[in-house]
Amino acid sequence: MEETEGLDAEITDGIILSKKEIPQSEIEKLKSELGIEYLDSAFSEYILSYNWGNFGFLSYQFGYDDETSLSWLINRNLDYDEYPALRKKNLIIIANGDPYTILLDCKSGEIYAFTSDMTYEEIVTVASDFEEFVRAMGTAQYAVWKNAEKEFIESMEREYSESSLKFWKELVSVY
């Protein structure tokens, strides 16, 4: 990839999404252990096909040191004290960062962000689905690499509400 050409592999590890084949049985295990009936199919396809278990965008980490299973996703949710409240709302945690935690609505596929200061009624929609979220996060990371944060926010202003923009602005440090 041109953008990361010449960088030390230790730096690029975890910021380049690479193909991985994780068995479908991991989705069934995830659903069973988290007590969820349905998991958005687009999200399922992405997490079975790529190395989300060792990947992040900017300050947001999906998984860490787990490229062969979905244990990172199971543990992230089960270790969260308020997971039962999330499960009742069909939500799971898919990434953590500062200051937001990223949630997936298991049925609709919508992506939300919330902070420890928010109630679950105040969560903010940041993307209509996982693919849109990933594309926006990747674009944000590229904008930071190219010092084009303001241009990134200008493009996001055409797509997102003011409450969503707060997340995207904080992601690229534009206030």
Residues of each region from the PLM?
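Compact, glycine/acidic-enriched structural inserts
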Residues: 113-146
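Generic alpha-helical structural element
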Residues: 19, 32, 119-122, 157-160
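Short acidic-glycine loop/turn motifs at beta-strand connectors
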Residues: 105-108
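Residue-level detector of alpha-helical secondary structure
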Residues: 31, 131-134, 157, 169
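Acidic, proline/glycine-rich low-complexity IDRs
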Residues: 142-175
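A surface-exposed partner-binding patch
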Residues: 1-102, 163-175
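Extended hydrophobic/aromatic-rich secondary-structure runs
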Residues: 57, 127, 135-136, 156-160
